[in-house]
Amino acid sequence: MSFKDKDERISCLEAYVTLTSKSSRFTDETEILKMSQRHSGQAGTEAGNGADSPPIVNSKYSTFRDFCSTSSFQDSGYNELKSCSFDNIDKEYLGKKEKGPTLLYEHPETSGLGLTHPLESPTQKKKCILPRKEKDKTPELCETPKISGKKCLPRRRLNVSFALLKGDFESQNSSLESSISQVINLEKNIPSSASGFSRANNFSPLVTSTLKTEEVTSCSQKLRLNFSQQKTSTIDDSKDDCSLFEVECISPIQGNNFKDSITHDFSDSSLCINDENACPELLGSSVSGTTCGTDEDIFVTPISNLVANIRFNASQILSPSPEVRGSISTPEDSGFNSLSLEKSEDSLSDQEGSFQELLQKHKGTPKVGDTIRKTRHLGRSRRLSTLREQSSQSETEEEKQIVHPDSEKRAAAASAISEGQLSSDESGDLTFSLKNLSKTPALQLVHELFMKSKRKRLQENSGHEFLEQGDGEKIAVLQCILAGLIGKKMGIEKLDILTELKYRNLKHILAMVLESLTAESLCSVWKVSRNWREIVVQDKNANRRRKFYITQLKTDSEGAVLNVEDAATRLQLLNRSALRSVQAQARIPGSQREQGSTLSPWGEVLTPLASSSVTHLSSKQEEYVKVAKTLFTDEALKPCPRCQSPAKYQPYKKRGLCSRTACGFDFCVLCLCAYHGSEECSRGAAKPRNRKDALPGSAQSKRNLKRL
């Protein structure tokens, strides 16, 4: 009889192990319920036979007790079993317990301590009835047949898509909850006298533990935690965060149903119990395991969090909302849900940074992982905002012509600054203003331009024109400041220096530049651009020189209109050396210059063009007359070879001196070079004198005159 009961109990235990390994598939739950109903009918027929029938085995609770024994490892789990004692004590059955046989069971997959499962009396069988059949007196067995075939590892089943389970989720969820409630009610109704001996005669381990139940559980679970981290976790050891080992690490949604889960007690169970009042004695600690205090007791294993993953995927597909996203604490290490999180992160708006900052303010001290993730989000949002602001950059180019080629870099920096300012205005953590850019007017201008473009886009929805006027005034002031900025044109290949000097109102520098130019260069400057033309007009001296040069060009092009016979000869004074003393004494009457029509010295009427040249000639003649009054008897006048002004020279010494104080050129009359004294001329005389030529007033000249 004992061997038969042992075989049946082992078959029940193996059936439950199969149920636990296949619990992630909802299709198996329907078969489990059908088989349990079938065995309940058989158990009802056997209940009428008496005490010879096999006792009811609560497979789930036995597995839980096996878990308690195996999870404690070397520390004895006897006290833990004692804490999970049964409440309903049958006093009549205690007297008969000593004679009843006891059976020793071990978990087929573990090598820990064995647990005793005694025979149960018929009176106890009547108490182990499911809630829906409490009125009936037929017990029910939770047994499933062995399933043959290739077993699938639990870790491989994590890759099962939720789309395959979506159709059967609603229909099979109710059956799953009903089966869970059946198992829980079985646990509640199991009597505390489950062992075949009295408490005094129970088998006790050789070494008993002095730790409390919570300490034993936490110690054993810490050992399992180390194993799970070595096998399945990618968590960095340097990061200390108590929230790493929550179910949030795989399912980051905290709902009310999460508080009802007993994942921290049933770490190998993938079932989530929603009944808060179900079997509170079997729970090692409070059910609210979401706080930081119980985070150390929660295991990060894929099997224990399978249902959490399924619920997270269900809530994400069926009812996605951005508000749930705001209330989560995103995990630092989650190799199972990183792909789904990154897909949702790509759809964030540009204000992700400010949203995360607000979340950090409410949560308190920021975490290291959250900081890294926030920088990642900010980098992604910055890249998105840079792509979106390319259109706004074209608008700002229409509003303000930026000549600097490096302004694109400053524009990118200013866009980042403006984004930082917008996000800081929302979060209130940072304060940024133009005071930080007080010494960089160029950056101020670029910043104002980008802020204006952003406000312009905001004003499309709500029309406020007064803000636009304020922006225009700020930009005008900054442009005035930027006009005097030194070094803002650095790096440009071509630069209009004269225009820049004009904008800075540096007229004295422009006057020096124009004075160094010739009249011909001034005419060329006039033809360059409108700005350069205005520069020449503003300088009166340069403009006068330009006009005079133009008149000379016209005179040279049209030629002289003078028809006087000796007009050409009189201009060449070097060829008229014999009559030079006579020409110095000639005068032009002043009455002729006052007449309406200009007359030549010989009484001929001249055209206006010819009169201008004669006027110039008359001024030269007046200079010669003025200098001739100061001549000595042995001196004569000769034009200076450099400035053509009257110069005094001595024929015997062959030396001349310019009368103009500005020139004062001392030259040799023969070679027209600088006076060199008694030395021979470096080059031949300007005009070698003929031997027949005689000095005026000499005997040879008198003879020549007589001969004529």
Curated annotation (Swiss-Prot):
Record note on what altering residue 98 to G does: In SPGF64; uncertain significance
GO cellular component: nucleus
Disulfide bonds: none
First and last residue of the signal peptide: none
Pathway stated in the Swiss-Prot or TrEMBL entry: Protein modification; protein ubiquitination
Alphabetized UniProt keyword annotations: Disease variant, Meiosis, Metal-binding, Phosphoprotein, Ubl conjugation, Ubl conjugation pathway, Zinc, Zinc-finger
Keyword field contains Zinc: yes
Domain of life: Eukaryota
Positions carrying Phosphothreonine: 234
F-box domain location: 490-547
Pfam families assigned to the protein according to its UniProt record, in alphabetical order: F-box
Region (Disordered): 35-55, 320-426, 682-708
PTM comment text: Phosphorylated on Ser-76, Thr-234 and Ser-334 in response to calcium, which is a prerequisite for ubiquitination and proteasomal degradation.
Protein purpose: Required to establish and maintain the arrest of oocytes at the second meiotic metaphase until fertilization. Acts by inhibiting the anaphase-promoting complex/cyclosome (APC/C) ubiquitin ligase. Probably recognizes and binds to some phosphorylated proteins and promotes their ubiquitination and degradation. Plays a vital role in modulating the ubiquitilation of CCNB1 and CDK1 during gametogenesis.
UniProt name for this protein: F-box only protein 43
Originating organism: Homo sapiens
Biological classification of the source: Eukaryota, Metazoa, Chordata, Craniata, Vertebrata
